[in-house]
Amino acid sequence: FLPKMSTKLRVPYRRGTKDYH
């Protein structure tokens, strides 16, 4: 499992904001 994928999947509005958008 990757911490980056889990993070954006769990909290896409916290750390995946710049990555998700």
Curated annotation (Swiss-Prot):
The miscellaneous remark of the record is: Minimum inhibitory concentrations (MIC) are the following: E.coli standard strain (MIC=12.5 ug/ml), E.coli drug-resistant strain (MIC=15 ug/ml), S.aureus standard strain (MIC=1.2 ug/ml), S.aureus drug-resistant strain (MIC=5.0 ug/ml), B.dysenteriae standard and drug-resistant strains (MIC=7.5 ug/ml) and C.albicans (MIC=15 ug/ml).
Report one GO cellular component: extracellular region
Q: Supply the alphabetized keyword list.
A: Antibiotic, Antimicrobial, Cytolysis, Fungicide, Hemolysis, Secreted
Name of the protein this chain belongs to: Antimicrobial peptide scolopin-1
According to its UniProt entry, the function of this protein is described as: Antimicrobial peptide against both Gram-positive, -negative and yeast. Also induces histamine release by mast cells and shows moderate hemolytic activities against both human and rabbit red cells.
Q: What is its main location?
A: secreted
Report the subcellular localization: Secreted
Q: Per its UniProt entry, which superkingdom is the organism in? A: Eukaryota
Q: Does the keyword Cell inner membrane apply?
A: no
